[in-house]
Every structure is written in structure tokens, then in C-alpha cells.
């Protein structure tokens, strides 16, 4: 299994991958984990995004923010069928 890892600023993410990334975040955080909160928090535009693409699909992602002298890693997710494969 060869995953293509992308590290991108928000403005560098193409529309196709952005849609898949947001869809995956909604699927995992809202549906699976029942975390009803505003995912779009205006921090994505300032973050670096680590995106794992396999078979032309976003299967993993996270974001890294630098705030007040610290790096914050968040929104870490892996598509359910790819978990427990040492991707995260």
C-alpha cells in the first residue's frame, strides 16, 4: 500500500482534495464520534495540512498550527477501513 503524503498550506489544497478532506472530517468527527461542533473554525486557513491520498481518495489527514510559540497538531483522522495499519 503506497500512500501519497501531501503537506500543504490551505490555499494549495485543490478543490477535489479539500472536499474529500472536509467530508472525511465530518464522517469521522460528527457521524462516528457524535461530536456535534463547528468543524470549520477559521483555523484551517492558517494551518499546514498533512493529507494521505491512496487510490485517488483522501484516507487520512491532520492539521498543524503554530500559535503563541507552540505547534498544535489536531483534526487527526484515518478513514475507518484503513485504521490499524500504522497510518496515523
Task: Give the ranges of each region predicted by the language model.
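Short amphipathic alpha-helix that is part of the acyltransferase structural core
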Residues: 1-48, 54
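Short strand-loop junctions, especially beta-strand C-caps/beta-turns
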Residues: 8-10, 76, 81
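Short, surface-exposed acidic/glycine-rich loop or hinge patches that mediate macromolecular interfaces
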Residues: 12-15, 67, 81
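Conserved beta-strand in the GNAT
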Residues: 51, 56-65, 70-77
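Conserved acetyl-CoA pyrophosphate-binding loop and the N-cap/start of the following alpha-helix
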Residues: 82-87
